[in-house]
Swiss-Prot record:
SUPFAM superfamilies: Enolase C-terminal domain-like, Enolase N-terminal domain-like
UniProt key word Iron: no
Disulfide bonds: none
Marked site: Important for activity and substrate specificity: 323
Molecular function terms from GO: gluconate dehydratase activity; magnesium ion binding
Name used for this protein in its record: D-galactonate dehydratase family member SBI_01856
Cofactor(s) named in the record: Mg(2+)
Pfam families in UniProt: MR_MLE_C, MR_MLE_N
Reaction catalysed by this enzyme: D-gluconate = 2-dehydro-3-deoxy-D-gluconate + H2O
EC annotation from Swiss-Prot or TrEMBL: 4.2.1.-, 4.2.1.39
């Protein structure tokens, strides 16, 4: 005879907040009968309302009456119970619930989440930020500015001659923000040949300028063929990159075997992956050095830990996606995982506009090139709901890319 379930608390309310303090975020609030509140992040850049609807219409009704302490059972319930599972909308929704439940468990026990994950294995988490410039001198100035801010690792992106817009390069004084507000996505023109001619010169100039100590990263953003990726990797080996990111479209994983045979440059991929199964071949065949899965988009803390555990066996490290297109709740969750995970290598961090820090009050902090989640119970982030309500959702889309002949290509 099975033992009756012992329930110490009950979920009584689930609310979805969509707010746009400078850019769109989706937050999930779970409230228990004992008055505990847990926060999760459900932001999916350019598709925020799809996740908000999935949560409100298909997930929230299922959570009422459940025991918030049963985190893994709830994860399995939402994942296996959705026959049409996987995909960014489903996994981001599950991730938001998972984060909120870990937040509640931390508050219920008076512990920061990283303590519930086994405790800290490091004192702080190395982070990298972004630097860009249309010309090499501008890029070098931007890299110097990041170094003055204490960063020990920088992703460098530059303009390309003949192209009016380039992924990762700011168009003005403000930081880079790819999502444009409006009724339709912006169209950018892309030329791979120009990029392949220009990128090695740019990154070599950055390395010569900064010397050997700075960790230097670069993102090709899924735009290359296998042959082009291998060629670029070979050209960048003397630059000593920390990693070369997303060289080919993520759907075509088999091509990483070809690329791996032709270059020793460290490879990173995974920000668009949603489950451990998408990472499995790349990890177990050691076709990558870093997996970049995001805690929000990959089913939350519970599932990111599964990815980390598989990766650790095969000596693959984590470097999760975490720019400003996920909220401070997501960054906090990633930091708690990072502090407690042996093969966690580095965390992406671009910072936020000041108003975002006001809406999402957080315990995590940055100093000297590193982040720490703080020691408040739970995730250490609270949302000012009244302030969030002052920033209603504004439609925004990530750009699309076309070649010079007008045909579509990967952005």
């Amino acid at each position: 005879m099975s033992r009756p379930a012992h329930k110490t608390d009950t979920i009584v309310a689930v609310d979805v907040l969509v707010t746009s303090p400078g850019r769109n975020f989706v937050a999930l609030k779970i409230t228990t009968e004992q008055g505990l509140v847990g926060w999760g992040d459900a932001t999916l850049n350019g598709r925020e309302l799809a996740v908000a609807s999935y949560l409100r219409d298909h997930v929230a009704p299922l959570l009422i009456g459940r025991d918030p302490a049963r985190i893994e059972d709830t994860w399995q319930y939402l994942y296996r119970g959705a026959y049409w599972r996987r995909g960014p909308v489903t996994m981001t929704s599950i991730g938001a619930v998972d984060l909120a439940l870990w937040d509640i468990k931390g508050k219920a026990t008076g512990q920061p989440v990283y303590q519930l994950l086994g405790g800290a294995v490091r004192d702080r988490i190395l982070t990298y930020t972004h630097a860009s410039g249309w010309e090499i001198p501008q890029l070098l100035d931007a890299v110097d500015e990041r170094r003055e801010q204490g960063f020990l690792a920088v992703r460098a992106q530059s303009g390309i001659p003949g192209l009016a817009t380039v992924y990762g390069v700011s168009s003005g004084e403000a930081g880079y923000e790819p999502a444009d507000r409006g009724a339709a996505p912006a169209v950018e023109v892309w030329d791979t040949d120009s990029y392949l001619r220009h990128a090695p010169r740019v990154l070599a100039a950055v390395r010569e300028h900064v010397g050997p100590e700075l960790k230097l990263l670069h993102d090709a953003h899924h735009r290359l063929t296998p042959g082009q990726a291998a060629r670029l990797g070979r050209a960048l080996e003397e630059v000593d990159l920390y990693w070369l990111e997303d060289v080919t479209p993520a759907e075509n994983q088999e091509v990483l075997r070809h690329i791996r045979h032709h270059t020793t440059v460290p490879l990173a991929i995974g920000e668009v992956f949603n489950t451990v199964w998408e990472c499995q071949t790349l990890i177990t065949e050691q076709l990558i050095d870093f997996v970049r899965t995001c805690v929000t988009h990959a089913g939350g803390i519970s599932h990111l830990r599964r990815i980390a555990a598989l990766a650790e066996v095969w000596q693959v490290r984590l470097g999760p996606h975490g720019p400003s297109d996920v909220s401070p709740v997501a960054l906090a969750a990633s930091l708690h995982v990072g502090l407690a995970t042996p093969n966690f290598a580095i965390q992406e961090y671009m910072g936020y506009e000041p108003v975002v820090h006001e809406v999402f009050r957080h315990a995590w902090s940055y100093a000297d090139g590193h982040l720490h989640p703080g020691d408040q119970p739970g995730l250490g982030v609270e949302v000012d709901e009244a302030l969030a309500a002052r920033f209603p959702y504004e439609p925004a889309y990530l750009p699309i890319a076309r070649r010079r002949d007008g045909s579509m290509t990967d952005w």
